[in-house]
């Protein structure tokens, strides 16, 4: 695998004080292996750092515990230390994330100190699924924005060039 440390800039539409920063350090990693290897590594990382055991539940199980459809920052605060897995499609998982047979994404959020601290997922190897979700996530608004910014010809050319790669199970 490999990693990098960079600075991230993000303009959240409705920032929560103390939770959303416009500029923050970002530690990113990519590793060989699917979501099971990813989950194992993240659990081992938390153990190595001496953090409390994580309560691990799917998105639907967490939302059922809180009697809600959508998890928000108040729910994450209540979770404290935990892991949210298997995100439903309506949460708009990124287009290159792998999907389970039930349509949920192979995505993991690690909640530490009541906040999403690690956001990770298995990358897809299914070229048709990636092409389709590129155009359909967030009701098509993501693709529309990228096309508006860079032009349809360039976006479609670069998407098709990306999809020509030979993909293998990886996550980050």
Model regions: which residues?
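A translation/RNA-centric and nucleic-acid-associated enzymatic feature enriched
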Residues: 1-172
